């Protein structure tokens, strides 16, 4: 199987995991546990997993140098600590529909950050792809009502999600050099440890206050899904893909989440499909294609390469 096919498959699985998480998380919060408590369980669980995995798979691989260590700290703060604290705080207050809409700002941040920090070429095709995919995602979400699932302070929740999307978009850019230089487990163990330093002081009270004995099997399954799939598997696949794809491509796959969320709802009998939504989904896939398509050989000769791996 070609590496490019594996990359797109990994990113699709990540989008599917995140799409389901919007609804699954709302089943747990705030009735069974507060958002900060969930973040603590996710980050601590992932920290233990990636630390053990690093010891087994790459025990002699270490992040060295002042620049790389500072980059790993920034990645842990933005991509793990702030990212997850802001996301679950926002999702606790707003609706899954609003949250998935605002998340589509992340690719825009990623493209701009790539141009500023990595000197990645901001081509017309890439800008057009981001715009087309954003139009498809926005049209899906705006065509649905989001008031029933919102919390008590929807505006504040929307602001938290906006900040979360911004932090994640920048994280994709700054962590990429580390993922291409070190073993993925080395990087993930470090950045989750940094995230845990932020999450433990904030979330330990909510985690300790939860009545775990009252959790039905479905809630335990939801918590396990958020720790194993949303945190460990999704971050592992995302960061592996960064070795072969540009941050802009990873960011653009966020646009798949609203479309996949609709398909999940249809499969569960909670929503219905229409020709309008099918067209909106096609817009999203067209945008992903425009961002990820390789340039022609003639274009490669005229434009300097962006880095060791072309998207």
Region spans (language model):
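Hydrophobic/aromatic residues within transmembrane alpha-helices
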Residues: 28, 38, 42, 90, ...
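Alpha-helical transmembrane segments of compact multi-pass small-molecule transporters, enriched
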Residues: 21, 45-49, 102-116, 131, ...
């Amino acid at each position: 199987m070609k590496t490019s096919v594996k990359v797109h498959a990994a990113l699709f699985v990540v989008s599917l995991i995140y799409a389901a998480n919007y609804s699954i998380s709302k089943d747990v919060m705030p009735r069974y546990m507060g958002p900060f408590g969930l973040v603590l369980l996710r980050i601590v669980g992932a920290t233990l997993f990636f630390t053990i995995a690093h010891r087994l798979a790459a025990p002699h691989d270490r992040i060295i140098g002042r620049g790389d260590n500072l980059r790993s700290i920034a990645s842990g703060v933005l991509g793990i600590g702030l990212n997850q604290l802001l996301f679950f705080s926002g999702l606790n207050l707003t609706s899954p529909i609003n949250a998935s809409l605002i998340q589509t700002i992340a690719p825009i941040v990623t493209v701009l950050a790539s141009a500023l920090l990595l000197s990645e070429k901001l081509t017309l095709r890439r800008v057009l792809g981001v715009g087309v995919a954003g139009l498809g995602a926005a049209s899906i979400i705006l065509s649905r009502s989001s008031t029933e699932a919102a919390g008590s302070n929807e505006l504040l929740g929307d602001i938290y999600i906006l900040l979360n999307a911004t932090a994640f978009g920048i994280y994709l850019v700054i962590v990429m050099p580390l993922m291409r230089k070190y073993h993925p487990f080395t990087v993930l163990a470090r950045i989750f440890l940094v995230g845990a330093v932020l999450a433990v002081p904030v979330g330990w009270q909510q985690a300790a206050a939860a009545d775990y004995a009252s959790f039905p099997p479905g809630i335990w399954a939801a918590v396990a899904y958020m720790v194993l799939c949303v945190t460990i598997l999704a971050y592992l696949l995302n960061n592996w893909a960064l070795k072969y794809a540009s941050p802009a491509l990873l960011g653009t796959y966020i646009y798949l989440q609203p479309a996949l969320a609709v398909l999940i709802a249809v499969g569960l009998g909670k929503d219905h499909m229409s020709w309008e939504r099918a067209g909106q989904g096609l817009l999203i896939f067209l945008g992903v294609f425009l961002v990820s398509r390789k340039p022609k050989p003639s274009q490669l000769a005229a434009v300097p390469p962006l880095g060791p791996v072309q998207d």
